[in-house]
Every structure is written in C-alpha cells, then in structure tokens.
C-alpha cells in the first residue's frame, strides 16, 4: 500500500491528536498543516499536551513549518480553503478539523485546492450530500466513485452507534433515550460570559454541570438507518478535561436479560467490533479510560435492568483520543478500498 499523504486544516485539539495518532503509522505521511496560529506555537502545542502528555518524538520549528523526528511538515495560514496549496503539497486526503467547513459546499473547497478527498472530523450539516461513515459500523459503505467528502460524525455518535448496533442486531431496539456526561471542550468559557445560542453554555466550565443539547443520538440513524426516529438524547457538560460516558436507556423488542446483553457486548468486542468496542467488568472510573483508543467501552458493572424489555447501559469513551484514532482508521480503510477499486 502506497503511503497516504494527508493534510490537516485546523490544528486544534482534534487536528493535533489526529497527527499524534498517525505520525508513526508507516502508511501515512502528513504533508501540510493549515492554521492561523504561527508554526512555533503549533509545535509547542503538539509537543506539550496537558491531557495526553508530552509527545514522544523530537519536535522542532522552522519559519514555514514544523519538524517531527526529522520529517518536515509545511505550515500555512490561509483563511479560504480553496486557496490552500494541497495540490502543490501532494495531499491525497484532507482532515477538515476547523469545525467551520462541515457542509458540502465548504468542504469541497479543499477539492478545488487539489485534495482528492475530505474527511470532516465533526457531524456534517449536509447529511443528504455528505455520507457519514463510522469505522466498525458502516465504513464498508464507502463508495470511491461518489464519496469525495465524508463525515466521521461526533465522538459521542462514535461511542453510541456500536452499542446501539449490538442491541438492535441481537434484541431489537424499539426506542431509547441517551445522555452523555461529557468532558469540557474548547467551546466552553473558563468563567461566566454571554453565549448567544445557549445561555447555560456560557457559564464557567470548571464550576458547573451544564445541561446541553446534542444531535449525537439522532445522528446514529445516519449510519444505522433502521434506528431512524428511535433515538434522541441530551448532554451534561462536566468539569473534567477528558473522557466522557454515554448512558442509554432503552426498550427491546425481544424479551431478554441484562446478563444476555452483557454477553452480546462481550462477544462483539472480541469479534466483529474488536478494536472499536471495548468491554470491562472492573470497578473503573473516567480517568481509567484516558488514552483508550476504542470508540466505546461497555461497562458491564454499571448497567441496570427494570424488566425483560427495559434496560440502561453505560459506555465510556476518550472523546479526544478514541475519536482521533477513528479518523486515522477511516482514512486508511477508505484508501485501501480506493486502491482495490482501481485494480
């Protein structure tokens, strides 16, 4: 397999962690970074991370880029993606991680700039034109002839979808309500301030448990159409830096038991969803999952059963690191299918 050449647009939390997740992969070469922040600051933020620790690579700065273990990655600062030098840099795929260009029109500017494909590291605002693909759930639907732009959805959808898939495949999921207890993110202020769309979201992140909306549960239907109209959810933002947890309360079509649900999750975690869905029956807490690469880790000791058709299950996820690893996995699965189609 020829090396996949990747550009990153937006070197924030996810952009940097995608690079960390892929930098030592022999099948990936990062060829460019676009961010309005100067290269020396980008290199500093890549090297030192308060949550995930120091990068175990040598990181240096040049005027026009950063050097990681001797490999030079050019950095540019261009506001309009259509003007980026992806063609000149040889970028095959671009990870769109600014959070700004999440529809077809915005993301397609990277194609105009010379990239072959775009992976949006966020839910798309244009689901009818941009396919949502989740590794382990529906990534095999990638069509090299049509899918020039794809979305990797959100970290929460990546956590919920494998759980929902196992439940639905084995017992039938008739309806469900999800709550994600979600770590702080960069959109939240450190102290109280105005927030135009969501007043509660403007309150100090480190001081409060903040109820919030999320489209993550409904978005599961984009990758599991059979669950359309059966799931919705909400979020609580909590004062922790990383690792979140999904709580799904649901009804099943088939009468079953919590023990049988746990058995189905364990089987999937060791089989069809190995590496995507994890399983634990230990007495764990959130920090135990920091640095975990799974999309979702089912917690057998945390779920409950009301009756043979009504249950609650709990699944953990490192909302930064797990998600960033899925972006890398998605790119590699896409290019592999692309190369097979070309033979």
UniProtKB/Swiss-Prot annotation:
The keyword Iron does not apply. Keywords: Cytoplasm, Glycolysis, NAD, Nucleotide-binding, Oxidoreductase. It comes from the Bacteria. Its EC number is 1.2.1.12. It catalyses: D-glyceraldehyde 3-phosphate + phosphate + NAD(+) = (2R)-3-phospho-glyceroyl phosphate + NADH + H(+). D-glyceraldehyde 3-phosphate binds at residues 154-156, 185, 214-215, 237. PANTHER family: GLYCERALDEHYDE 3-PHOSPHATE DEHYDROGENASE, GLYCERALDEHYDE-3-PHOSPHATE DEHYDROGENASE-RELATED. Catalyzes the oxidative phosphorylation of glyceraldehyde 3-phosphate (G3P) to 1,3-bisphosphoglycerate (BPG) using the cofactor NAD. The first reaction step involves the formation of a hemiacetal intermediate between G3P and a cysteine residue, and this hemiacetal intermediate is then oxidized to a thioester, with concomitant reduction of NAD to NADH. The reduced NADH is then exchanged with the second NAD, and the thioester is attacked by a nucleophilic inorganic phosphate to produce BPG. Homotetramer. This is Glyceraldehyde-3-phosphate dehydrogenase 1. The gene is gap1.
């Amino acid at each position: 397999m020829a090396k996949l050449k990747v550009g990153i647009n937006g070197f924030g939390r996810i952009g940097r962690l995608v690079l960390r997740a892929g930098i030592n992969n022999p099948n990936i070469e990062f060829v460019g970074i676009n961010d309005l922040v100067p290269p020396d600051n980008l290199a500093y933020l890549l090297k030192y991370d308060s949550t995930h620790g120091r990068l175990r690579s040598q990181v240096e700065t040049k005027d026009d880029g950063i050097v990681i273990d001797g490999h030079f990655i050019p950095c540019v600062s261009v506001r309009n993606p259509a003007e980026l030098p992806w063609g000149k840099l040889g970028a095959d795929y671009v990870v769109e991680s600014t959070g700004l260009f999440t529809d077809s029109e915005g993301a397609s500017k990277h194609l105009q700039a010379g990239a072959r494909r775009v992976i949006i590291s966020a839910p798309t605002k244009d689901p009818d034109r941009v396919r949502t693909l989740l590794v382990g759930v529906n990534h095999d639907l990638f069509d090299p002839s049509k899918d020039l732009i794809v979305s990797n959805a959100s970290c929460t959808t990546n956590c919920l979808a494998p759980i929902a898939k196992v439940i639905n495949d084995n017992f039938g999921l008739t309806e469900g309500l999800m709550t994600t207890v979600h770590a702080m993110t960069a959109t939240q202020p450190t102290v109280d301030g105005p927030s135009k769309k969501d007043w509660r979201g403007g309150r100090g992140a480190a001081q409060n448990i903040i109820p919030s909306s999320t489209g993550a549960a409904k978005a599961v239907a984009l990758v599991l159409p059979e669950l359309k109209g059966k799931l919705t959810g909400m979020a609580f933002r909590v004062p922790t830096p990383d690792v979140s947890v999904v709580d799904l309360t649901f009804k099943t079509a088939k009468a079953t038991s919590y023990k049988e649900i746990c058995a189905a999750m364990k089987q999937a975690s060791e089989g069809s969803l190995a590496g995507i869905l994890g399983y634990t029956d230990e007495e764990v807490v959130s920090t135990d999952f920091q640095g975990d690469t799974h999309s979702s880790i089912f917690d057998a000791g945390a779920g409950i059963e009301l009756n043979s058709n009504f249950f609650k299950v709990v699944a953990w996820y490192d909302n930064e690191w797990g998600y960033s690893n899925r972006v890398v996995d998605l790119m590699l699965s896409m290019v592999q299918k692309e190369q097979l189609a070309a033979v």
